[in-house]
Amino acid sequence: VDKVNEFEHGIDTVNKSRSDSLYFGSISNEQFRYASSDELLNTDNGKKVFRGMIEAFFNSQQKRLKVLSSYAKGDNYSILSGNRRLDNEKADYRVRHKWGGYISSFATNYVIGNPVSIGILEGAEKKQLETIQEIEWNNDINALNGDLALDASIYGRAFEYHFRDKDGADRVVLINPLEMFVVRDLTVEQNIILAVHLPVFADKVNMTVYTKDQTITYKPYTTNAVRLTVDTTTKHEYRDVPVVEWWNNRYRMGDFESEISLIDAYDAGQSDTANYMSDLNDAMLLIKGDLEALGLSASDIAKMKDANTLLLQTGISANGQQTSADAGYIYKQYDVNGTEAYKNRLANDIHRFSRIPNLEDDRFNATSSGIALLYKMIGLEQVRKNKETYFTKALRRRYELISNIHKAINKPTIEASKLTFTFHPNIPQDVWNEIKAYIEAGGVVSQETLMNNASFTDYKTEQGRILKETGASDNEIMQLVGGMNEQES
């Protein structure tokens, strides 16, 4: 018989054990390392180790990445695959919450939602910035940076691949982390010695390996039968592996990876609530009394229940006493306050440990000043600083690769070591309060600055309008302000 008050523990069904927690073994995020790419690809022992790396990637690392992907998309693995209420007569809602996607999207847009500014150190050639701007334009680099940062936030790692297209333009493209891994050397610098791209098409792995001077393709094979048969080998002139690995942090962990158990508990709590509300509609009818004296049979009770009517008439028992009858429903007790407090606590813990501020917190919204707001976001600020450190390494390697290929083919020089990268956190700024405070402190602000900070106009547009009102011709306006930003006659 089902026990009334053990619903929330999930032990009121034939499934006596419910385990939804996930644990990724150390190999699932292990860095692959070897002495050199030549030994790894061309010696018997190296090939054996290389085959083991590929198998470990498919059997262990890719599984972790797929689980993280499911949480980022809201198809939370545990709630959908865990053993829960298997009784056919009971509700079995699997309520998913896109916490993973929310956390990664919030953190990514905060850190890199605004374009990264590239500058140069004093004494560096300024003309190289024009070359960099052309490369960024050709590759829609702001969108690419956003995608890379999002992958890093979800998976803990992200990959970009470099090549030159048929028109001789520098290309940088995103590679799915579920389809690539890198191998690093055994030095303290842990340099990348090769990158392995393993996309699967028609159930076949179409593997390509990139070394510091070669691109090697292999004949297709299945994931459960790795075969290292070289198909083609071509040279490249990057003088390094043309792949950049972006790290999210020191441990290559996703922003919500440590909070998965909390997300699972939140999903389970909401699912249990939904199940309770559904099962309450199917509560068991209880009739107490001398049913024999009432003359009721099981079929009589069933007919009355179907008619949504229950008639109970008392009478006199055989010994002359008055009979009694009572009817009601048995339903499982639900501690509303306790359950809601539990789910709120889980939600707060998810925010706390992921360092993502809870924007629905009244205490958060009550804060109006910018500096106080930043204090409440101090946790996310620490995450941002850490991400920027690793993203800067990736960006510098990006331009080192481009610099290498430009030197090899006599294209415009890029001094990667002299580039600076400035990140701009995507947070609302009260610019007008700053301007007001600056003016009150004795500072002078130009009309151009004031107009450019207005949401409804800008300097060129407004100056053009003013000149036009004074009778200036279109040619005069063009010479003075360079034309207006809006289409006006």
Question: Language-model segments: what does each one mean?
Answer:
Residues A124-Q128, E136-N145, A152, S258, ...:
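Short amphipathic alpha-helical segments
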Residues A149, S153-I154, F159-D255:
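Extended, regular secondary-structure scaffolds
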Residues V1-V173, S489:
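Extended, helix-rich architectural segments
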Residues S299-G320, G338, R345-S489:
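C-terminal helix-loop subdomains that flank or include functional centers
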Residues Q61-R64, D75, G113, N139-A143, ...:
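Short secondary-structure junctions and interdomain/linker hinges
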Residues Q128-I132, A325-G328, M377:
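A short, surface-exposed helix-loop junction/capping segment
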